[in-house]
Amino acid sequence: MKILIPTAKELNTQVAQIEPESLSEKTKLIIRALSQYSVADLAQLYQIRPEKAKEEYQRIQKLQNETALTYPALYLFDGLMYRNIKRKNLTKEEEQYVQNHLLITSSLYGVIPALAPIAPHRLDFMTKLKVEKQSLKKLWTETYGQAVADQEILLSLLSSEFEEVFPKEVRDKMIRFKFMEEKDGKRKIHSTISKKARGQFLSYLIENHITKLSDIKQSSFSGFKFQENLSQEREFVFVKKVDG
């Protein structure tokens, strides 16, 4: 069983650094392509302010020169979902679970173990960057598929932006999750609920070393409970009742 989570724009470089690992050929190609961009080019590419573009330019040059500092991906990313994942004071068993089951889908590094070393960067699949005349999604599709080809159980906590990178035969195997709040008999779903709940759900999986779909259906965490009547074979729905 593998669990797939996306990257995040928010980063925390106040965490402990770790030694870098050798980069894949695709990652090197992307870095080489980005290294040709000026600060002004990057501001346009990412639709960001000049000062942010300058920061990104410096990051890219460090990646190109192999002087970039690297951090465990799970700790470097610090978006809302990540802030709701249990990341501190993991037991040996919990850390082993993370190493065995959790994968992060990156537009720069590919599908990587959650604790793999990565450098700070801004790139995502919405970036209109061409590498060898291919979009980032096209560039990575085959590699993404190979990364999880042998997995029978594939849990996706990804947005469509990341799921679409995988080949159809892999997407068809994915178990997806919907997290909803119910208030006064009405159920709703929105981005903030989903991002927080994904992190809380992942924490539950880590703490309880969950590896079976039957155990996921018994899950209860942070007020969310599995709803058999709302779920489908490959879409599991969890609902949290909140006071009116």
Swiss-Prot record:
InterPro entries: YaaA. GO terms for biological process: response to hydroperoxide. It comes from the Bacteria. GO terms for cellular component: cytosol. Pfam families: H2O2_YaaD. Belongs to the UPF0246 family. This is UPF0246 protein SGO_1307.
